[in-house]
UniProtKB/Swiss-Prot annotation:
Keyword presence, Ribosomal protein: yes
SUPFAM superfamilies: Ribosomal protein L30p/L7e
InterPro entries: Ribo_uL30_ferredoxin-like_sf, Ribosomal_uL30_bac-type, Ribosomal_uL30_ferredoxin-like
A single Gene Ontology CC term: cytosolic large ribosomal subunit
A Pfam family this chain is assigned to: Ribosomal_L30
UniProt protein name: Large ribosomal subunit protein uL30
Protein's GO biological process: translation
Organism: Delftia acidovorans (strain DSM 14801 / SPH-1)
Keywords for the protein's UniProt record, in alphabetical order: Ribonucleoprotein, Ribosomal protein
Molecular function in Gene Ontology: structural constituent of ribosome
Length: 60
């Protein structure tokens, strides 16, 4: 079994008042409440999602 690289993301700003697609991206990353943390596989798709909403999240 190979170990995948992971990345932890924390929601640090509320998605209220942002574009609907940005809110959907937040939900797609598994983030719900403010300061919630999600551990995800480090793939180009996930990196693109993080880049899209970089003003809402912090990479730990």
């Amino acid at each position: 079994m190979t170990t995948q690289q992971t990345v932890k993301v924390q929601l640090v700003r509320s998605p209220i008042g942002t574009k609907e697609s940005h809110r959907a991206t937040v939900r797609g990353l598994g983030l719900r409440k403010l300061n919630s943390i999600s551990e995800l596989q480090d793939t180009p798709a996930v990196r693109g999602m993080i880049n899209k909403i970089s003003y809402l999240v912090k990479v730990l």
